[in-house]
Amino acid sequence: MAIDLKKHKSRRIILTKQGKRTERHIPVLLQPVLAGLIPLVGAKVIDGTFGAGGYTRALLNAGAQVIALDRDPHAIREGQSLVDEFFPRLRLVQGNFSQLDCVVEEKVDAVILDIGVSSMQLDEAERGFSFQKDGPLDMRMAQTGFTAADVVNRLKSDELARIFKILGEERYARRIARMIEKRRCVQPFLRTGDLAHAIEVLVGRKSGERIHPATRVFQALRIYVNDEIGELARGLFAAERVLKPGGRLGVVSFHSLEDRMVKRFFSARSGESVRSRYLPEIEMAPATFFPLFKGGITANKEELERNPRSRSARLRIGVRTEAECLFADMKLFGLAKIASFEGGKK
């Protein structure tokens, strides 16, 4: 079935409660997502990362029934108008997508996961996700638990360095961690702009350099605060449990660490052996997925021009087989261990 994407694109301009015009979130790789999950008419789909509702709206416009989850209470509040608009085909649930198998009573036709921070969260300075706008050093998606400020002001430098190195793939992880530990003794880091500036002064920035030197540190802190790696791993296993045979799992990731996890999952679940320096070779098991589009799908030139945030996005899709679910072993991903925040509390 062909999809007329002009009908299903999210509207770009909306009115806020104050009557001001604002731009609606543009979901990345929307066309490949819709094409990869078809047929959608009457399909039961889980959108595990509702965010600003871009994918959910497009899925609903294509005729699907959607259960959408998000751990961010702000996203849930903002999404109520969409629930009213598409009642009864949309159910909105506050919760982590790692628990998506707890919100459905029967198998579903598709699951879509858009990993990482949403544009809505990035654009709100008070949420503290971005250094583009100064705000409190927060970064909590669910708005509960410890903040990024707690992490940088309490963890030892070697623990910080490990977080920056593993979760942010930051080459200057140790230097930055030592600087943070030394500086916070005089004045704690409480603002995004303060931390970003301190990193820029330490590392330096060449004229015309596109990527800010604090980018990878902010990425690492956000991933750590929200346990995004654990969430992704558990979410992949949960999707395996809820998809019916022939059902499709689509995952959009934005950096190499997440993409490697998704790739390893589909490789292992398709019957391929997986190698890692962290664990012995995993024996082949009955395939529960077969992946589509080897190497994944990235944004084309047109989308890159329209939505620069799609630059680093990659979509991977797997089709569920009839095989029984396999054991949910976190070792499959070959991840190095990082200390929990409990050791950093006063």
From Swiss-Prot:
UniProt EC number: 2.1.1.199
One GO CC term, this protein: cytoplasm
Signal peptide: none
Predominant localisation class: cytoplasm
Species name: Bartonella henselae (strain ATCC 49882 / DSM 28221 / CCUG 30454 / Houston 1) (Rochalimaea henselae)
Pfam families: Methyltransf_5
Source species taxonomy: Bacteria, Pseudomonadati, Pseudomonadota, Alphaproteobacteria, Hyphomicrobiales
Entries under NCBIfam families matching the protein: 16S rRNA (cytosine(1402)-N(4))-methyltransferase RsmH
Gene transcribed to yield this protein: rsmH
GO molecular function: rRNA (cytosine-N4-)-methyltransferase activity
Its job: Specifically methylates the N4 position of cytidine in position 1402 (C1402) of 16S rRNA.
Top enzyme category: transferase
Name under which the protein is recorded: Ribosomal RNA small subunit methyltransferase H
Record keywords, A-Z: Cytoplasm, Methyltransferase, rRNA processing, S-adenosyl-L-methionine, Transferase
Reactions catalysed: cytidine(1402) in 16S rRNA + S-adenosyl-L-methionine = N(4)-methylcytidine(1402) in 16S rRNA + S-adenosyl-L-homocysteine + H(+)
